[in-house]
From Swiss-Prot:
Biological process (GO), any one: L-tryptophan catabolic process
Needed co-factor(s): Fe(2+)
Chain sites annotated for binding O2: R44
Encoding gene, per UniProt annotation: BNA1
Organism: Pyricularia oryzae (strain 70-15 / ATCC MYA-4617 / FGSC 8958) (Rice blast fungus)
Name of the protein in question: 3-hydroxyanthranilate 3,4-dioxygenase
Catalytic activity: 3-hydroxyanthranilate + O2 = (2Z,4Z)-2-amino-3-carboxymuconate 6-semialdehyde
Amino acid sequence: MLGPPVNLPKWLEENSHLLKPPINNYCVYNDDFTVMIVGGPNARTDYHINQTPEWFYQYKGAMMLKVVDDGVFRDIIIREGDMFLLPGNTPHNPVRFADTVGVVLEQRRPEGSIDRMRWYCQNPDCTPGQVVHEASFHCTDLGTQIKAGVESFKTDESLRKCGKCGELADWCPKPGSILDPNKA
């Protein structure tokens, strides 16, 4: 049986307490497509890589999508009312700021597909794009698996140490290290 439509403003009024760090997401639908409502702020430094595209719609405020595009690190600002389709296999780190809300749509992962969470060395003197740690898994529950990966990286310093320069990678962005486009 089909469920009723979701009224986003009403849902947020009644359920915004469900958007908890470090990911701040809640899966509204989780069938052939996963539809997540995502609030800010979040606190993560990983770059997620999945084999299927992701669709972003920014309902309130602006977000920053940090990506690695053909080996180049760059930031894409998705403003209130904007939508953006991220191709599969693109390393990305969604940065959400306080009092912002977006909707993200992802395909159910095909059998045998592998998601990855990758952390890069943040030391400017190290090799650009140096991977500190990468976790791989078949994603069946976006609501819990990404959060578990972030928590694992946070609590295990051995995962955070760069094998090339020895720098300890941050598990969350340092305060003030990312400029909020909502305040520009």
